[in-house]
Amino acid sequence: MPPKPLFPNVFPGDGAPRKRRLALALLAVPGLVPAVSYAQLSGAAAQPQPLDSPWDLRLAPQLEDHPLKDGAKPAAFVIADHTSGTAEQDLAAKGSAELRRGDAVVKADALHYDQDTDMADAYGQVRVINGGTSFAGPEAHLKVEANQGFMTAPKYHFNVTGGSGSAERVDLLDSERSVFVNGTYTACQCATDPAWYIKGSRFDFDTGADEGTARNGVLFFQGVPIFASPWLTFPLSGERRSGLLPPTFSLNSNNGFELTLPYYFNIAPNRDLTITPRIISRRGVQTEASFRYLSPTYSGTLTANYLPDDRLAHRNRYAIYWQHQQNFGGGFGGYVYFNKVSDNTYPEDLGSTNEFINGTQTLYQQEAGLTYNNGPWSVLARYQHWQTLPPSIAPYSREPQLNVKYTKYNVGGFDFGAEADYSRFRITTADATEGDRIVFNPYIAYGVYGPGYFVVPKVQYHFASYDLNYLSSSTPNSPKRFTESIPTVSFDTGLIFDRSVRLFGQDFIQTLEPRLYYVYTPYRDQSNAPLFDTAESDFGLAEIYQPNTFVGNDRIADANRITAGLTSRFIDPRTGDERARFVIAQQYYFANQRVTLNSVQAPVQARHSDLIVGAALKLGSGFMSETAFQYNQNNNQLVKSSIGFGFSPGERRVINVGYRYTRANTTLDNQPINQFLVSAQWPLTRRLYAVGRFNYDLAANRVVDGLLGLQYDADCWALGVGAQRFANGVNSSGQQNSSTRFMMQLTLKGLSSIDNGLVAAFRAGVPGYTALPSAPPPMSRFSNYE
């Protein structure tokens, strides 16, 4: 007896008009009753909707996932031009056949579905969609709900991650795992001829773990093989995954050709390790390991590299960098900052290979400390040591230091506090004074603030006690134990006026803010005190309203002076943005300052200080400007100036122009500065960007540092090239040496990327630089819903 056809009244036979007809085969449960409804609505949309026919489906306002109840089986839906089969057993469909069950969809010219085994056999233009992954090929055989089976000659696409490729065969293990034989993979979104792809004898994909593995993989770029490995792992979505990272290339005038082959270990979501062998043509093979870790209570980075038997230096070279932050709770914390190199010439020889070292660095800090912060209390206990490379002069180390601060605000209108500090100073320089110092600095201030004024009188004391265990031969008669007590009284007051003005067709609020700051500190002889941590303060708008002209606790300048300043601002009343600011200030002396940094310096003898003038503008269309001048009226000389202009009308469009001038740099190297600086990032075409920096010393007629690069941004790859001339080391006379390097960086979007220093150089050299966009954001699994 022939099998009874399904729905004989719905499909009258081959003689019916050839229009698309629907066979709704509900094979999941007996009686043709659906196991679960997949369109669950809310609100007005959840109300019963009138249907045009018994076989119409109600439309849902959005695509949603609704899990089945425990033990329930999803219904099976079949759409085709022609169907036949046995009720509750099997179904054959021909002509634009489509089978849906749960999340799985099978489309083909013809298919056969067995209800008992949940097995679907599809032939001709087959498409299988499950969990956001689609496969297309001539033939497929699979268990629909379990998504287990195989397809021949498939083309595949991961809708969520954007990856795609083809193979001779794919074996589907479940809804997340699949194995491809003799296939390809790419994250390029182009349908044909991808810019880069991986070709391998076998691919194992796990979309749940977001990981792909290629056996005998070869990475092609523009049809050219650029890398091969018997085992390649890579992320499917561009997220962090263990595996090889793209190699990087550079050419350095000191080291020759450099090639890096980094391997990334994604140990845990909060820990990773990168091992980077670096081939340096002139020196050998350097190995670097960088470990990063993060937790709710601590974080840090530990990086170390080692170059055995440097062929140029004829010795082993290494560098170590460790930065750690710890939160113990209850206001207690700790930290470690450790930076060390193997020898004096390491920075200039190998500094370009380290992101935490530059070629001119001569001081390396090695410090560990404990902190406490709770309310008004702040405590620091630390041990600090310095590694000093010539020609720098070694600073004093604190071995150890204990610093305690207490600060209270607005207690009956008073602000008061104190700082207590104990330090034991040690130094590696021979014949230098060493010893202990205790400092206690209390203060009290009373501030009166109103809508348009403020008045703040303040009294503070400086107490210091020295216990020196070794005296320099230059000061053999100085006492080893002595104390200092120095009071300071200051009075700070100002007014704030404002008015509405209209300039250039725009409304502004203009302020006028005069300010007077008076400070008195009596003279105390401090020539016996060594210079443990003290230097001359810079002189500018940030320092002109400070009581002491020195930084540190070994010198307190005597003072009887008043500072007069005037500030005017122009504020946009709609947004509150400050569009312009102009400042002028000067100090006037009632007595000469007698305290100097050392006995060689002459006391300050003048009626007033240099004049300080500054201006800042922030106009429309991305234009900004900051300018500052220090002018000596007695000598009619410009002592210091800084002029800067910035223009950034859009993303990745920025131009900076600056000029720096210093007649005499007494706090650094006593050398004048007369430099012109220009930097920019600008698009040349829709995809090509130019990046550059040029810093020229007008006094020495030489390039201090320069950078010129190009970046090309394609849909699924980016290429950057750059040439950089940079300061690298300091000679015995204190002048900077220079080196040149060439860098090239290829980024394969959707695979992985690593910076070989090119992007870091662009970002450091061009204020406002914006990196090229990464791969487009992943799509939803419903983006290409079928």
Swiss-Prot record:
GO cellular component, one term: transporter complex
Top-level taxon of origin: Bacteria
Leader peptide range in chain numbering: 1-39
Subcellular location: Cell outer membrane
Record bears the keyword Nucleotide-binding: no
Keyword terms, alphabetized: Cell outer membrane, Membrane, Signal
GO biological process: Gram-negative-bacterium-type cell outer membrane assembly; lipopolysaccharide transport
SUBUNIT field: Component of the lipopolysaccharide transport and assembly complex. Interacts with LptE and LptA.
Described purpose of this protein according to its UniProt entry: Together with LptE, is involved in the assembly of lipopolysaccharide (LPS) at the surface of the outer membrane.
Family: Belongs to the LptD family.
HAMAP family cross-referenced by the UniProt entry: LPS_assembly_LptD
PANTHER family linked to this entry: LPS-ASSEMBLY PROTEIN, LPS-ASSEMBLY PROTEIN LPTD
Name the UniProt record assigns to this protein: LPS-assembly protein LptD
